[in-house]
Regions:
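Intrinsically disordered, low-complexity regions enriched in acidic/Ser/Thr/Pro/Gln residues
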Residues: 1-151, 156-157
Length: 158
């Protein structure tokens, strides 16, 4: 890829490869993603899907030695609850859609607390901080990124 600041500097293209996950021995998802910070991706996805609520719910997480994939074990009751919901996973690739869940929304478990809605000005500040930290974003002009915030500052960046 040629797109450096001078218009001629060669830049490395961002890798995007398949990464699979099995939960309790069953295939759960395959992502197309940059192969960085995959352990954080796995934990975050398991949390977002409801397989884990706390650190102790992640009984084990093993990476595959031969290819990009992980085996995760969670408590059987949590696994059964998620799998028993009326959901149909649709794997999609591209910006904004990796896994889309179709099904009965009333069956999706709700969090115990409702997060606060951040201030718009503070949200803009946090997004600017997110993009400022992205080395690949700076060199390519665009790449997927994520951050964890407490609403005041960025706590972690990927």
């Amino acid at each position: 890829v040629t797109a450096g600041p001078d218009g001629a500097t060669p830049l490395d293209a961002v890798d995007e490869v398949p990464v699979w996950l099995e939960v309790n021995g069953q295939p759960a998802v395959t992502w197309m993603c940059t192969p960085d910070q995959l352990d954080a991706l796995v934990v975050g996805w398991c949390y977002g899907e409801g397989y884990i609520e706390h650190r102790d719910d992640l009984l084990s997480m093993r990476p595959c030695a031969r290819e990009l994939g992980f085996w995760v074990t969670v408590p059987e009751a949590r696994y059964a609850t998620v799998e028993g919901e009326e959901r149909r996973r649709v794997l999609a690739s591209g910006c904004g859609a990796v896994t889309t869940i179709l099904g009965a929304l009333h069956k999706v478990p709700r969090r115990a607390t409702t997060p606060a809605i951040p201030d718009l000005t503070q949200t803009r500040t946090l997004f600017k901080a997110l993009f400022a930290r992205g080395e690949r974003y700076q060199s390519t002009g665009g790449i997927h990124a994520a951050a964890l915030t407490d609403g005041v500052e960025l706590l972690n960046h990927a």
